[in-house]
């Protein structure tokens, strides 16, 4: 377990999965959640804080190895984060001396394991394919939305809008991503993905994350894109996704969508009283 000693300030760990980077705070045994929206915003500032795409807070949870809460760098909450879940699972498995863990998130109970090749895999649960579950603003088919480019919508505990394009590299990711994120069709805003088919069951994927902007990778986005591609007949259910920060693997099975990929622990530290005061 990371050093959370109060004498040296609140402890944290920096991790990333395929370049999708996180601050992890372990609040187990501390009497409840410690992170606030203000603290998340302060920590998320890459110039004045630590910087991250998402923050993951580990809490005590009866009947599971932990509960897990997610925050975006703008201080908003996120219902799920696939790569952060994999990173925290790696940390917990090392801490507990096991190769499998169970975590509770807003998405529900998730199971993670370490594969024989060393990659960390997590079952992200069944995709949400009904308009009311994602959610969208009104009833419609979710595999072909009434927007320019006819994207798909998939929920993975958070909403995703997926465009299949000829060349993902040519997309104005910042411009189009920001515009689609706040489209009225998505009452809770949305993550935005642009994907190109580059080989059998291989996709090039670029991501604009709700509340974070452009990120090098997105686990739930990889899952949503793989599901959307399979629904359209572009790929099978086992897909390799090549993102700016690395490669993620998705396997859509009957029991849920499995996300696999690398995990890296970067450093540990403690937040100063001055940083805590910014919260």
Swiss-Prot record:
Amino-acid biosynthesis is among the record's keywords: yes
Q: One GO CC annotation, please?
A: cytosol
- Check the record and name the Pfam families matching this protein: DAP_epimerase (PF01678)
State any GO BP term from the record.
Answer: lysine biosynthetic process via diaminopimelate
Principal localisation: cytoplasm
Q: Which reaction does it catalyse?
A: (2S,6S)-2,6-diaminopimelate = meso-2,6-diaminopimelate
Q: Quote the catalytic residue positions.
A: 81, 218
Its annotated pathway reads: Amino-acid biosynthesis; L-lysine biosynthesis via DAP pathway; DL-2,6-diaminopimelate from LL-2,6-diaminopimelate: step 1/1
For the site Could be important to modulate the pK values of the two catalytic cysteine residues, which positions are given?
Answer: 160, 209
Q: Which Gene3D superfamilies match?
A: Diaminopimelate Epimerase, Chain A, domain 1
Query: Quick one: which residues bind substrate?
Result: 20, 54, 72, 82-83, 158, 191, 209-210, 219-220
Respond yes or no to whether keyword Plastid is given for this record. Answer: no
MF annotations from Gene Ontology:
diaminopimelate epimerase activity
Q: Which UniProt keywords apply?
A: Amino-acid biosynthesis, Cytoplasm, Isomerase, Lysine biosynthesis
Could you describe the subunit structure of this protein? Homodimer.
Hey, which family's this protein in?
A: Belongs to the diaminopimelate epimerase family.
* The protein's name: Diaminopimelate epimerase
| Species, as recorded | Cereibacter sphaeroides (strain ATCC 17023 / DSM 158 / JCM 6121 / CCUG 31486 / LMG 2827 / NBRC 12203 / NCIMB 8253 / ATH 2.4.1.)
């Amino acid at each position: 377990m990371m050093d959370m000693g109060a004498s040296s300030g609140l402890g944290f760990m920096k991790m990333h999965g395929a370049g999708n980077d996180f601050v992890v705070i372990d609040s187990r045994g501390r009497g409840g959640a410690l992170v606030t929206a203000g603290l998340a915003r302060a920590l998320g500032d890459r110039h004045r804080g630590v910087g991250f795409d998402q923050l993951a807070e580990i809490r005590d949870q009866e009947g599971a190895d932990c509960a897990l809460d997610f925050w975006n760098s703008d201080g908003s909450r996120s219902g799920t984060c696939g790569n952060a879940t994999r990173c925290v699972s790696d940390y917990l498995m090392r801490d507990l001396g096991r190769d499998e863990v169970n975590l509770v998130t807003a998405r529900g109970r998730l199971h993670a394991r370490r594969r024989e090749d060393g990659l960390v895999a997590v079952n992200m649960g069944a995709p949400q394919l009904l308009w009311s579950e994602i959610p969208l603003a009104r009833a419609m088919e979710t595999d072909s939305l009434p927007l320019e480019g006819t994207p798909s919508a998939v929920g993975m505990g958070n909403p995703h809008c997926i465009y299949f394009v000829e060349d993902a590299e040519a997309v104005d990711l910042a411009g189009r991503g920001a515009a689609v994120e706040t489209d009225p069709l998505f009452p809770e805003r949305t993550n935005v993905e642009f994907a190109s088919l580059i080989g059998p069951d291989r996709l090039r994927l670029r991501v604009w994350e709700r509340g974070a902007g452009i990120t090098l990778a997105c686990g739930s986005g990889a899952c949503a894109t793989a599901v959307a591609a399979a629904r359209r007949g572009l790929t099978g259910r086992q897909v390799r996704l090549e993102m700016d920060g690395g490669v993620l693997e998705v396997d859509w099975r009957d029991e849920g969508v499995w996300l696999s990929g690398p995990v890296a622990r970067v450093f540990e530290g403690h937040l100063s009283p001055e940083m805590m005061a910014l919260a």
